[in-house]
Regions:
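Residues on the lipid-exposed face of transmembrane beta-strands in outer-membrane beta-barrel proteins
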Residues: 62-66, 94-100, 134-138, 166-170, ...
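Outer-membrane beta-barrel "beta-signal"
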Residues: 40, 160-192, 209-217, 337-376, ...
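Transmembrane beta-strand segments of Gram-negative outer membrane beta-barrel proteins
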Residues: 26-44, 74, 110, 198-218, ...
């Protein structure tokens, strides 16, 4: 074992010392004018199937849309129930759409979205759903909004609805280089020279969180537990992304999944804004306010939540900090209520430009974004015979160097009578040097996190997943990825063989060296 650790350490050190610095004016880049879209769909519920259901579920969606050409776009999106009695229903999917100018600032906008997810399984069955939308969009310089006719169909379940939906779209600019230029160092030799990267940089932060929810008030468990009082402390694993819009203010998105306290199945998704009320070289004091959705394993509620919090960042370096935080977690139209506290590891960076940083030295950060189909064979369940599961998965790989990378991934079931099952995992990967005409790489990965829902036997939710895989470069930044391994729950009976196949897009972001 010591020999293996020594070998890995040598690889890491070799990578750190093999960097050559280049002039930043020689680094070619690309600009994507993306959009973040929020939409709201009032979904009619199947009361002929279950008369006790509330008539309408309000579904909030957030979508990240990327232009393919001047009229076609693709992207990924999530939905969450925020009104009605389906709190805890979440989805993940991929989409393809068109936006075609009609006249002046008015556009025809239509898209098709496929994904997986769910809440109460008897209403969604496998979890697969289709969402088709068509309507008009008004394009302003700083935002867009529109109205659409929407068809939502959990086609193996009972939820099928036509409705008029609304959306708000916020533009976003993203600058990046080809992945072949990742993990290289650059110098800014002439600050006055005009080049592609002489643009404002974006400050952002990413955080892995470990939180504890202490339920209070009239918080209750789900119907399976006869809505007994919820008194157990909930242990949750979360991830948060922050984008600064000024020196002190930021927007953020944040999600959690339970791994202890209740049987797995509880999760949340929040959007919000925050401000650093005090900043120094060693400490940030901050306040945040978020709204979003939460549910699963608690009494049926609408799902809409509010979450104010305060905290402190204790800076270890210019890039890393230990973050401590506490808050108040409250359902807007329900009983779920809790005090929260926790800690996290936060990473700060300035990316995408050189104009607003004091840096003279820069480095390109390699990132892979993958959309996967994941298969889990002979999955153990608590309420039925073993089944084969199909999941739609979204993952991000962040290169530490040319060999090691960090992993963040989520997946939602769409086939296997387990709608509502999902996982969120993080981990470490090792990739080999490229071979066979420098197109093929081997990958060894170890990840763990929280998973559960729909009777999949993960007990309280902790899972680990070792895998071995291959990637093959198709063209420029695109590659095929395939892997196989095991998904195991240490506290439950889950022990399943896992096969993953997906398409990966690689890129390199420019960040200032601290």
């Amino acid at each position: 074992m010591k020999k293996y650790l020594f070998f890995l350490l040598v690889l890491f050190c070799v990578e750190l010392n093999s960097q050559q610095k280049n002039d930043i004016s020689n680094l070619s880049g690309h600009t994507l004018k993306n959009a973040v879209r929020f939409n709201f769909i009032p979904v009619g519920m199947p009361r002929n199937f279950d008369p006790d259901l509330k008539p309408t579920m309000g579904l909030l969606g957030v979508h990240y849309q990327i232009p393919i050409n001047n009229w076609l776009y693709g992207g990924v999106g999530m939905h969450a129930a925020i009104t009605g009695d389906q709190g805890g229903l979440f989805t993940l999917g991929a989409e393809l759409g068109i936006s075609k100018k009609i006249i002046r600032k008015w556009f025809l906008d239509a898209n098709f979205h496929f994904g997986g997810g769910g809440g109460y399984r008897y209403l969604v069955n496998d979890g697969a759903f289709l969402n088709a939308n068509i309507g008009i969009k008004y394009q302003h310089k700083k935002y867009a909004f529109g109205v659409q006719f929407s068809h939502l169909n959990f086609y193996t379940g009972e939820i099928k609805s036509d409705a008029v939906s609304l959306f708000l779209e916020i533009p976003s600019v993203f600058r990046f280089a080809d992945y072949k230029n990742a993990q290289k160092e650059f110098t800014l030799n002439n600050q006055d020279e005009d080049n592609f990267w002489k643009k404002p940089s974006t400050k952002n932060a990413q955080q892995v969180r470990f939180d504890f929810f202490k339920p209070i008030g009239n918080s209750k468990k789900d119907n399976v537990n006869n809505q007994a009082p919820l008194t157990e402390t909930l242990y949750v694993l979360g991830f948060e992304y922050q984008k600064y819009i000024s020196e002190k203010s930021f927007l953020f998105i944040h999600t959690d999944a339970i791994y202890k306290g209740l049987r797995a199945g509880f999760m949340d998704l929040f959007f919000g804004a925050g401000s650093n009320i005090h900043q120094s070289k060693s400490v940030n004091l901050f306040t945040k306010l978020a709204v979003g959705a939460a549910g699963g394993r608690v009494a049926p509620e609408g799902g809409f939540m509010i979450y104010p919090s305060i905290g402190i960042d204790l800076k270890l370096t210019n890039s890393f900090a230990i973050s401590l935080h506490s808050g108040y977690y409250r359902a807007i139209a329900g009983d779920l209520e809790a005090y929260t506290g926790g800690f996290g590891l936060k990473y700060f960076s300035n990316t995408g430009g050189t104009e607003t940083t004091l840096n003279k030295e820069y480095k390109t950060q390699g990132i892979h974004i993958q959309l996967q189909n994941q298969t889990y064979l002979d999955v153990q369940k608590t309420d039925s015979d073993n089944v084969d599961l199909q999941l739609i998965g979204l993952r991000f790989n962040y290169d530490l160097n040319n060999t090691f990378y960090l992993i963040g991934e989520t997946g939602f079931a769409y086939k296997g009578e387990s709608g509502g099952y999902a996982h969120g995992i993080v981990g470490l990967g090792i990739s080999s040097p490229a071979f066979l005409d420098e197109k093929l790489k081997a990958h060894l990965e170890f990840a763990g996190g929280a998973a559960g829902g729909a009777g999949v036997d993960t007990e309280e939710g902790i899972v680990i997943r070792p895998t071995l895989g291959l990637s093959y470069q198709l063209a420029n930044n695109f590659s095929l990825y395939a892997s196989g391994g095991k998904m195991i729950s240490p506290s439950g009976n889950l022990n399943t063989t896992n096969i993953n196949v997906g398409l990966s897009f690689g890129l390199a972001t420019l960040r200032g060296k601290n």
